Swiss-Prot record:
The chain crosses the membrane at residues 17-34. Belongs to the LCL3 family. This is Probable endonuclease LCL3. The active site is at R134, E142, R182. It is an enzyme of class 3 (hydrolase). The keyword Glycoprotein does not apply. It is a single-pass membrane protein. It comes from Candida glabrata (strain ATCC 2001 / BCRC 20586 / JCM 3761 / NBRC 0622 / NRRL Y-65 / CBS 138) (Yeast). Its main location: mitochondrion. Keywords: Calcium, Endonuclease, Hydrolase, Membrane, Metal-binding, Mitochondrion, Nuclease, Transmembrane, Transmembrane helix. Pfam families: SNase (PF00565). SMART domains: SNc.
Length: 257
């Protein structure tokens, strides 16, 4: 083989090596980019402990409510990216069973204190990879538990919240994780009039009071608004404010702790 042929052969091998290296770098770079994109935007969070610190107070999470435990907490199935993230066509979304049972609850359609037959559209679905969420800035009447009696309007608050959000998709903004491992969060659901604050709705209907704790309260900057509407609901004797001898959820907890 002549020197010229040898040089040409070396150049071809060198070019092939360079091309292979470039392709390898591009593939590796693309894989890293895809992985970072997935972990940042499309990775599902399955409990409150998995929520990154950078998300608290800054970002909204999208998902579906799969169960409602009482008047101020529920389980949230995180669906990052929504439809664009593959949910409903590549990634499975939990389907809830329709609830045919009619239950009496406080009417909220006409802003009265009259009881009406109202259907919680779906039944709770448990044992799913969900985030336990505690509504921020409010306290709903306590349901019966650990042998303690239920507070008046606790069942109304529970049924109202189930009717309002169970089986529906909404947004939460994580604010902190409480001592029970729940994500304390601000909550928004889409309506024809725009996004609605679920916590504020409950205060307006007299189905929750502004959170009474002296420390650790979270309002996402809306404490003043919550207190104004609590004052209005109280003046109108809406919901729990219609009682002659009112015991707030905070007072109830102190009594039975």
């Amino acid at each position: 083989m002549t020197n010229r042929s040898q040089d040409k052969h070396i150049l071809v091998n060198r070019d092939a090596l360079i091309d292979g290296t470039i392709v390898s770098v591009l593939v590796t770079g693309s894989a890293i980019t895809l992985y970072k994109g997935y972990t940042c935007y499309l990775k599902q969070l399955t409990n409150a402990s998995q929520i990154p610190t950078k998300v608290f107070r800054r970002k909204w999470l999208y998902g579906k409510v799969t169960s409602v435990g009482d008047g101020d907490n529920f389980h949230f199935f995180h669906m990052p990216g929504g439809v664009l993230g593959g949910w409903g066509w590549i990634r499975a979304v939990p389907k809830l069973t329709k609830n045919e049972k009619k239950t009496a609850s406080l009417s909220f359609h006409w802003g009265t204190n009259k009881l009406k037959q109202q259907n919680a559209t779906y039944k709770n679905k448990r044992n799913l990879p969900t985030i336990s969420v505690r509504a921020c800035g409010i306290d709903a009447p306590e349901c019966a538990h650990f042998g303690n009696p239920a507070q008046p309007y606790s069942e109304d608050a529970l049924i109202w919240l189930r009717h309002r959000i169970l089986g529906k998709k909404l947004w939460i903004k994580p604010l902190k994780t409480d001592q029970y491992g729940r994500c304390v969060a601000s909550i928004r659901i889409w309506t024809w009039l725009g996004y609605s604050d679920i916590c504020l709705e409950m205060i307006k209907e007299g189905l929750a009071v502004v959170y009474e704790g002296k420390t650790g309260a979270e309002f996402d900057g809306r404490e003043g608004k919550y207190r104004r509407h609590e004052f209005i609901a109280r003046a109108k004797k809406k919901g729990l404010w219609s009682q002659k001898r009112l015991q707030t959820p905070g007072e109830y907890k102190k009594r039975y702790q």
